Structures are given as structure tokens and as C-alpha cells.
């Protein structure tokens, strides 16, 4: 699901940049892979903000995705890696029509206990590393440095 959102947009944008500057298909592939992995990392970071950030900190409504019944990576991981009773509890909380702050805190606590946040943070780093590896073959340059800094910024960004 995340690949159909932000990742595909960023990947296509990066590949278009390469198309306008070179005929080398390997450059196009590298920039596409860079963009796809950066996009995946960006979306995961956004998913984490939804659970772990406050609106004042991130500019994003805390729990907004859950309130809209959107299933994001931390939830997917927990639903796939929990006991039947944990899964039932999580589904009940997420499907609740009215999601109070107390309800959202309980969802966050359960995701934390089940390892959903740690898993998502690890995947964020994994996709970030893949983005940098995709452009590893490029000569060192200001442009390459900028692309690497963009990946690093995404990992550490607070908004």
C-alpha cells in the first residue's frame, strides 16, 4: 500500500529527472530506486508521526490516520504478528466509531507493546540505506551529497 502512495510519486519524479539529463538506462534505474526507497522511508516516517507526534510538533493531527480508519505500517505489523486476543483487541479499538484520546493512547500503547513502532523505525532505516545504496555508483559530487542529505533529513526530521 505504501508503494502506491508517496513512493511511486517520488520514484517517478526522480526517474524523470534522470530522463531529462541522460540516455543511460542504468542511471534512470538508479534514480528510480533511490526515489522509490526514499518515498517508502518518507511514508513510514509520516506513519510514525501519526502515532508518536503531536499536532504542535509535526503539524499533523495526532491519530489522524487511525481516526480515518487508515491502516498504516505499525498497525499492519501488529495485526500480522500478534496473538488472536491481541489482534481482536486492536481491531476493536481501531474499528471503534468514536476514537477518544483515551482510545488513541490505548492503540499507541498496544502498538508499542507489540513492537510495531520498533519494526517501523527499522524499516525506515532499511529503506533509507537502500536509497543511499541506489546512488552509490555515482561519482562523489555536490548533487550526490544533496541526495544523501535528503535521505538523512527524512530520518531525523521532526515535521
Model segments located where?
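All-alpha prenyltransferase/terpene-synthase fold signal
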Residues: 1-159
Amino acid at each position: 500500500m505504501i508503494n502506491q502512495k508517496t513512493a511511486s510519486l517520488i520514484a517517478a519524479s526522480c526517474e524523470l529527472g534522470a530522463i531529462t539529463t541522460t540516455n543511460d538506462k542504468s542511471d534512470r534505474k538508479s534514480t528510480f530506486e533511490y526515489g522509490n526507497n526514499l518515498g517508502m522511508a518518507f511514508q513510514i516516517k509520516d506513519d510514525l508521526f501519526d502515532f508518536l507526534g503531536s499536532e504542535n510538533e509535526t503539524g499533523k493531527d495526532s491519530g489522524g490516520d487511525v481516526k480515518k480508519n487508515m491502516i498504516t505500517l505499525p498497525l499492519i505489523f501488529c495485526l500480522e504478528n500478534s496473538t488472536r486476543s491481541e489482534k481482536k483487541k486492536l481491531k476493536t479499538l481501531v474499528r471503534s466509531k468514536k476514537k477518544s484520546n483515551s482510545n488513541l493512547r490505548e492503540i499507541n500503547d498496544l502498538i508499542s507493546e507489540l513492537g510495531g513502532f520498533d519494526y517501523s523505525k527499522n524499516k525506515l532505516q532499511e529503506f533509507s540505506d537502500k536509497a543511499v545504496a541506489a546512488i552509490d555508483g555515482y561519482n562523489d559530487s555536490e548533487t550526490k551529497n544533496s541526495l544523501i542529505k535528503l535521505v538523512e533529513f527524512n530520518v531525523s526530521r521532526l515535521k
